[in-house]
Amino acid sequence: MSRSESPRPLLEMRGISKTFPAVRALDNVSLTVYPGEIHSLMGENGAGKSTLMKILSGAYRADAGGEILIDGTRIDIDGPLAARDAGVAVIYQELCLSPNLSVAENIYIGRELRRGNRRWGTIDRAAMARGCEDVLARLSASFGPDTLVDTLSIAEQQLVEIARAVHTRARILVMDEPTTPLSSRETEHLFRLIRQLREEGLAIIYISHRMAEIYELSDRVSVLRDGTYVGTLERASLSAERLVAMMVGRDISGFYKKEHAPYDPGHLLLSVRDIADDARVRGCSLDLHAGEVLGIAGLVGAGRTELARLIFGAEPRVRGDVKVGERTFGAHSPRDAIDAGLVYLTEDRKRQGLFLDMSVRDNINISVCNRDARLGSLDLARGAERARDAIASLSIRVPDANVNVGALSGGNQQKVLLSRLLETKPRVLILDEPTRGVDIGAKSEIYRIINELARAGVGVIVISSELPEIIGVADRVLVMREGEIAGELGGYTQTPITQEAIIALATGSQAELADAH
C-alpha cells in the first residue's frame, strides 16, 4: 500500500524527549511515517537520530510526556521485545547476527521452533529451515537457510537481517547507514529490495549522510538538529542547499565550491612512475602540482587505496619510483615519505589511524612529539597549546583536549586525525575517503580545509567513492580500473569531469564503445 492510498500514518512519534546526565539529547521531537513510504532521517552526528530510533526500538525509554502511536493506537515500547511485537525492526550499522549459527537460526533467534513442549523441547532446526525458505526466495537470496552466517559477505549478512525483519512481520523497518560497507553493485541490489518492501507496504526509516542516496530513495526527508525537530521536506522540494541549511542551521552555498586558484602546472610536487605491487596495482603513473586537488575515482576493488598506500610506502612495491620535489624515497618507508613532506590519511580511521583510548591532545601530538622533547622529557604545555590551536583551527567539537578520541563523533575523529597530519607541515596530502561516515557539517569543514591547503600551495589527492564529491573538489580526476589508470578528466585535458565520464572509464564501457566502432 502506498502513502497516497493510506491517509492515516502508520507511525507517529509525538513530543519525544530524552535526557541523559547533563545532556538533553532530544527535545520535543515528532516524526510521522506512512505505510509504503521511504522516510529518510538526516542530521549531523549528535543531532539525535540514533537516540530517537533507539527509543522506537525499545533500547531507550523516552522521558515522560511523549507518546508513540502505531496505526493510531498508543503503544508502550518498554524494551526490544515490545518493539518487535509492535512490528518495529532495526538494522544497525554493526549487524546483530550470531556468526556461528545458520541463517535459519539467526532468523528465528528468540523465537525458536521446538519439538513437543514449546518451552523445553529440543530445537527443530529442520522446521526452521523450511519456515524461512519462502522469505529467502522472496528476497532473492543466493544462499540457503542452512548456510553458516560466518561464511556470508557483509551484503549477504545484511540480507539475513532484512529477512529476519520480514519474517517477524515487521511493518516499520529502520536502516542506519546500510550502504557504508557495500560495493556499488551491492548497494544497487539493496535499493531494489528497499523499493520492493515499500511496494509491499512497509514503512522504511532510512538514515544516511549520503545526499545521492537520499535523492534516489526518499519519499520524504525529516531533519533533526541539536536534538530538535527542524522540519520535513517532500521529495519534490529536496535540494542539497536546503537540506544542508536545515541540518547545520546556516546557509552553506556552493557546498563543493573550489575556492583556490588554478594550480601551477610548472610546479611539480609529486611524481609517481610505473608503480606496482604484486597483485592490485599494475604500473600506475601520475603527477601532482602545487595547489592542485587531484581526484582518484573508480569502483570498489579498482586499486585506489592500494595505490595510495604504495605511494606512501605503507605497502611494498615491486617496481616504480616516487619522488616528492627532487627527493626519491624507499620502496617501503612511510617515515621517509613523511620526512619528504608526504602524508596519508587512511580510509579506516578507527583501526589504522587513531588511538581511540588516548586523548585528543595525545592523538594530535603523537607524530611530532619529538619536537617537544627536552632533556629526556616532554614539554606537555607546548603539546597542550598545539592541541588547542588545532581544535580551534579545524572546528573540532570537543569539551577539551583531554577527552578520549573514541568518545567523539565520526566527523570530529576525522578532524583530529587530519590535524595530526597537518602538524607535520606536509607538501603533499593523500586523503582516502576523507568524508566517509561523517555528517554534512563536518563534510563542509573538510572541504574548507582542502581549499585552504590548496590555496597555500599544498598538493592534495582525494580518493572518494562519492562522485559528486570528486567532481566538486577536484581540479583533475584520474579514474582507475582493475589496477590501472583508465583515463584522465579535467585540468588541461579539456575533458569535462562528469559522472557519466567517470562511470564509463571505471566500467570500461568507453573502451568497449571505441572498440565497437
UniProtKB/Swiss-Prot annotation:
Keywords annotated in UniProt: ATP-binding, Cell inner membrane, Cell membrane, Membrane, Nucleotide-binding, Repeat, Sugar transport, Translocase, Transport
Subcellular location, principal: membrane
TM segment ranges: none
Membrane topology: Peripheral membrane protein
Domain ABC transporter as annotated: residue spans: 11-251, 263-507
InterPro entries hit by this protein: AAA+_ATPase, ABC_carbohydrate_import_ATPase, ABC_transporter-like_ATP-bd, ABC_transporter-like_CS, P-loop_NTPase
EC supergroup of this enzyme: translocase
Binding-site residues for ATP, renumbered to this chain: G43, E44, N45, G46, A47, G48, K49, S50
Domain of life: Bacteria
Record's subcellular location: Cell inner membrane
Keyword Cytoplasm: no
GO annotations of cellular component type: plasma membrane
A Gene Ontology molecular function term of the record: ATP binding
UniProt-listed Enzyme Commission number(s): 7.5.2.7
Reaction catalyzed: D-ribose(out) + ATP + H2O = D-ribose(in) + ADP + phosphate + H(+)
Role noted for this protein: Part of the ABC transporter complex RbsABC involved in ribose import. Responsible for energy coupling to the transport system.
Family stated for the protein in its record: Belongs to the ABC transporter superfamily. Ribose importer (TC 3.A.1.2.1) family.
PANTHER family: CARBOHYDRATE TRANSPORT ATP-BINDING PROTEIN MG119-RELATED, D-ALLOSE IMPORT ATP-BINDING PROTEIN ALSA-RELATED
Subunit structure: The complex is composed of an ATP-binding protein (RbsA), two transmembrane proteins (RbsC) and a solute-binding protein (RbsB).
Record protein name field: Ribose import ATP-binding protein RbsA 1
Source organism (scientific name): Burkholderia lata (strain ATCC 17760 / DSM 23089 / LMG 22485 / NCIMB 9086 / R18194 / 383)
